[in-house]
From Swiss-Prot:
The gene is TIF3A1. GO terms for molecular function: mRNA binding; translation initiation factor activity. Component of the eukaryotic translation initiation factor 3 (eIF-3) complex. RNA-binding component of the eukaryotic translation initiation factor 3 (eIF-3) complex, which is involved in protein synthesis of a specialized repertoire of mRNAs and, together with other initiation factors, stimulates binding of mRNA and methionyl-tRNAi to the 40S ribosome. The eIF-3 complex specifically targets and initiates translation of a subset of mRNAs involved in cell proliferation. This is Eukaryotic translation initiation factor 3 subunit A.
């Protein structure tokens, strides 16, 4: 893959390749550039490259390359310049459309060119044979060869663009435009399969949008602009689906539109709702859902009447007539279903009711379901009857409010004939293209037939078939019979056809039917009134009062009994339904398990049979292959050998392989013998040939020498002649140019002098320039040398100062260390003396205490005797001992220890000095500020039995030193 420093270089390279006809190489070069990781930031040249890239993709019909390139370009432009991506995609779709249109116009031009009077005369025999063999027409073949590839590429373009633009809030408008173009393509060329695929893709895009809500740049469907774009796309999808008669896709599109409309509380635009309900009328009519078809027409009528102010009275009358006829076309009875079918029908009604915006409350017990009576009451309340045409109103009155069993059909038939002629296209203001009332004629004829049968059953017990056929002129009696059977099945009318007697018998319907209940209630009221008039009741106030007292309780009890009975019946029904449902579930489960077991067994049996068949087939194929190879080897042996090989026994591959091996060995030996004999013969022939050709070669060599000698002499003569001619021509040229020799010499001399002068001048200038340069260089070197000398002197001076300073510091440090050592030695000596002195004093004090104790024991008197005064010697000894004892932390010289110290008592002296008397403390001397390590040195001689007190000892030492 070639790498380019700039994107413009890749574009130039691609254009060069295009000019020489290598479009594939140009496309590959641009593809490598676009997919490269070096260009991940958007640049203006990338847009030109993408334009050229999509042009090449369209020319070569490379849809996969186009998709890869557009995906990479979307990543580059997503956060920087989305408009550039839009321009590229629009250019891509425009080129694809143009190519498809060109192919189509080319085929049309070809068809016009072939549209001549005598087609047979223009066709060649080869064309006729080809058309006969292929069985295709010229147009179909042209379409497959020219148009179809471009249409496939155009469709692939639409799919690629939709895939690239999906679920992107910045590209919603372009996404909607592409979807509309794809729908129009399917509509124009009747592409139903492609339309289904496109709708499926768009639906999946919306599902993924709702599923992955944390996606970046996802469209917000709650925004009005986004929702409107999606609604417009689905409405266009609905239109195209109905025009292509894809009713299932149309119904799914309606559900998509309804789902989008329910996502927001705001009501969509009336124009969208008009299209929505107009298409719903078509879908429901096709699916024979006449009730919801009428509801859709009612919604459409309300929208047109409320929002369309430009609607003419004629258009409104046509729409109202359609609504009323659609309501009349609904079957007058509801179909009955089983238990499971009822649930399915209920779910279906829920879905369809939601589509026509008919709200159903699932929690209500007696909720209002969409029905024909409710719909007719809605039409009356909404004023639809007043807006409909007179013929439609008359038809409504005849079918719903008149009781004319004999003349009903005859009165309805002319009205239906008039109604069938009403209709046509509406104005552009109505948003409904066309109204056809004739589509309701068949349903209205069926309704008229049912009304005739219903009313006839009320007045006739039986009627002849001929008379009934005259009463219903719309259908043959077979059709009437079919309609009556369906009505009887749904308990709408009780009827029985007796073909033997040629009569139709009407029976009584169920006791629960509405019609019979009405007749019985009316009859009961009439009989009750007659009884009252004939036999008026006797007034008995006393009994009436007693009856009135107990009447409330009776009514209450009866009401409770009826409610209890109703609840019991409901519970029994529910229990019965539950039991039936459980039984059906159990049966279904058993059936499914047995079916599953049967299916598994059948699958295992089929697999075994298939495996056995496969093994048999492989074995047969191997045997057949071995036999075929054996036959082939036999044939090869028979072809190669001189005699026919006959094999006895069964034909096997191994036997023929052994036979072939033996035959090959025999042939090899024979061939070796033949080759040896042939080599000996060739030696004889070669030796004889060389003996015969030796004199002939010598003769030919001599002849060739003579020929070459003659040729050499001829070449020498020709060369001499040419040299003479050249010499003569050179002499003539010299004579011609000799007259200009003087001028040439003068010019040469002048030029030499000028060049010498110029050379001297330039040399002088060069010498001067060199001298100046040398002097300047000398000056610079002198300056640098002086500067370096000064810098060296300065460095030497600084170095000397630094060495002197270090020497001073070193001497001061050594002096300090000596002084410290001397001081430490003195302190050690003093401490040693002090320690010895303390030991001596302790021994003396101990001896003194022992003497005092002995003296006190000797002079101790009885308890009652007065205490005698101590002898004078003892007191003197004690005083001497007390005087001899030194004060705490005070140094006493030796010459003062034995002297008289009675003048200054030691106790008062110690109290005055220290404030208290305590044990003897001896600490080291205090450390000086300039010697921090002296205290650590003096701690080594301190004993463990003397506590340390730095403050007191330091102050004592300082005082003693002072």
């Amino acid at each position: 893959m070639a790498t380019f420093a700039k994107p413009e270089n890749a574009l130039k390279r691609a254009e060069e390749l295009i000019h020489v006809g290598q479009k594939q190489s140009a496309l590959q070069a641009l593809h490598d550039l676009i997919t490269s990781k070096r260009y991940r930031s958007w640049q203006k040249p990338l847009e030109k490259i993408m334009m050229k890239y999509v042009e090449l993709c369209v020319d070569l019909r490379k849809g996969r390359f186009a998709k890869d390139g557009l995906i990479q370009y979307r990543i580059v432009c997503q956060q920087v310049n989305v408009s550039s991506l839009e321009d590229v995609i629009k250019h891509f779709m425009q080129l694809s459309n143009e190519k498809a249109e060109q192919a189509k116009s080319q085929v049309e031009a070809l068809e016009d060119a072939l549209d001549v009077e005598d087609l047979e005369a223009d066709k060649r025999p080869e064309d006729l044979m080809l058309s006969f063999v292929s069985g295709e027409k010229g147009k179909d073949r042209s379409d497959k060869e020219v148009v179809t590839p471009w249409f496939k590429f155009l469709w692939e373009t639409y799919r690629t663009v939709l895939e690239i633009l999906r679920n992107n809030s910045k590209l919603e408008a372009l996404y909607a435009m592409t979807a509309h173009r794809a729908f129009q393509f399917c509509k124009q060329y009747k592409r139903t399969t492609e339309f289904r695929s496109c709708v499926r893709s768009i639906r999946n895009h919306l599902a993924n949008l709702n599923k992955y809500r944390d996606q970046r740049d996802r469209p917000d469907l709650t925004a009005p602009e986004s929702l409107q774009l999606y609604l417009d796309t689905r409405v266009e999808q609905l239109k195209v689906a109905t025009e292509l008669s894809l009713w299932q896709e149309a119904f799914r599109s309606v559900e998509d539109i309804h789902g989008l409309m329910t996502m927001v509380k705001k009501m969509p635009k009336p124009s969208i709702l008009v299209v929505y309900y107009a298409k719903l009328t078509e879908i429901f009519w096709i699916s024979d859902s006449h009730l919801y078809h009428a509801y859709a027409w009612l919604k459409l009528f309300n929208l047109q009447k409320s929002y369309n102010k430009n609607l003419s009275q004629k258009d409104l009358q046509l729409i109202a007539s359609s609504v009323l006829l659609a309501a009349l076309s609904v079957s007058p009875y509801d179909k009955k279903y089983g238990a499971f079918e009822t649930e399915n029908e209920k779910e279906r009604n829920m879905r369809l009711s939601n589509l026509v915006n008919f709200s159903l409350d699932n929690k209500r017990e007696n909720r209002e379901m969409p029905s024909r009576p409710y719909l007719l009451s809605e039409l009356a309340s909404k004023g639809v009857l007043s807006c409909a045409s007179q013929e439609v109103r008359d038809l409504y009155n005849l079918l719903e409010h008149r009781f004319l069993p004999l003349d009903l059909a005859s009165k309805v038939q002319p009205l239906l004939l008039k109604i069938s002629k009403i209709g046509g296209k509406l104005s552009s203001a109505s948003s409904v293209p066309e109204v056809k009332l004739s589509q309701y004629i068949s349903a209205l004829e069926k309704l008229t037939t049912l009304r005739v049968l219903q009313q006839a059953s009320c007045i006739f017990k039986s009627i002849k078939i001929d008379m009934l056929s005259r009463m219903i002129p719309f259908f043959d009696f077979s059709v009437v019979e079919k309609i009556s059977v369906d009505a009887a099945k749904q308990n709408f009318v009780a009827i029985k056809v007796d073909h033997l007697s040629g009569v139709v018998q009407f029976g009584t319907v169920d006791i629960e039917s509405d019609g019979l209940s009405d007749h019985l209630s009316v009859l009961a009221d009439s009989l009750n009134k007659a009884r009252i008039h004939i036999c008026p009741p006797v007034k008995k106030p006393s009994k009436l009062g007693e009856s009135l007292i107990s009447l409330a309780a009776i009514v209450e009890n009866e009401h409770k009994r009826l409610l209890a009975r109703k609840s019991i019946i409901e519970k029994r029904k529910e229990e019965l339904e539950r039991q039936i449902l459980e039984k059906e579930k159990e049966e279904e489960k058993k059936r499914m398990s047995s079916q599953k077991k049967t299916v598994d067994e059948e699958r295992v049996r089929l697999l075994n049979e298939q495996r056995q068949r496969e093994q048999d087939r492989i074995r047969r194929e191997i045997e057949e292959k071995n036999k075929a190879e054996a036959k082939k080897m036999l044939e090869d042996l028979n072809k190669a050998g001189k005699k026919h090989v006959v094999v006895e026994g069964e034909l096997t591959k191994e036997a023929y392989m052994e036979l072939a091996r033996n035959e090959q060995l025999k042939e090899r030996h024979e061939m070796e013998k033949k080759l040896q004999k042939f080599a000996k013969t060739m030696d004889y022939l070669e030796r004889a040939k060389r003996q015969e050709e030796a004199p002939l070669i010598e003769q030919a060599f001599q002849k060739r020498l003579e020929e070459e000698k003659i040729l050499h002499e001829q070449e020498q003569l020709r060369e001499i002649e040419l040299s003479k001619q050249h010499h003569a021509s050179d002499l003539q040229e010299k004579n011609r140019l000799s007259r200009m020799l003087e001028h040439k010499n003068a010019l040469q001399e002048r030029i030499i002098q000028e060049r010498a002068a110029e050379f001297g001048r330039l040399k002088k200038e060069r010498d001067e320039r060199m001298n100046r340069l040398i002097s300047s260089r000398k000056h610079e070197r002198e300056t640098v040398r002086k500067l370096m000398f000064y810098l060296n002197l300065e460095e030497q001076r600084i170095e000397m100062l630094r060495e002197e300073e270090e020497a001073r510091k070193r001497e001061a440090e050594e002096r300090r260390k000596r002084e410290e050592a001397e001081r430490k030695a003195k302190l050690d000596a003093i401490a040693e003396k002090q320690r010895l002195r303390e030991i001596e004093l302790e021994e003396k004090a101990k001896a003194t205490r022992e003497k005092l104790l002995k003296g006190s024991e000797a002079v101790r008197a009885p308890d009652s005797a007065p205490v005698a005064q101590p002898p004078r010697e003892s007191a003197a000894a004690a005083a001497a001992a007390a005087a001899a004892a030194p004060a705490p932390s005070k140094y006493i010289p030796k010459f003062k220890r034995g002297g008289d110290s009675s003048s200054i008592p030691s106790g008062s002296r110690d109290e005055d000095r220290w404030g208290s008397r305590g044990p003897l403390r001896q600490d080291g001397p205090p450390a000086r500020l300039d010697a921090p390590s002296s205290r650590q040195d003096t701690d080594r001689w301190r004993g463990s039995r003397f506590p340390s007190n730095s403050t007191s000892s330091s102050s004592t030492w300082s005082r003693s030193r002072n």
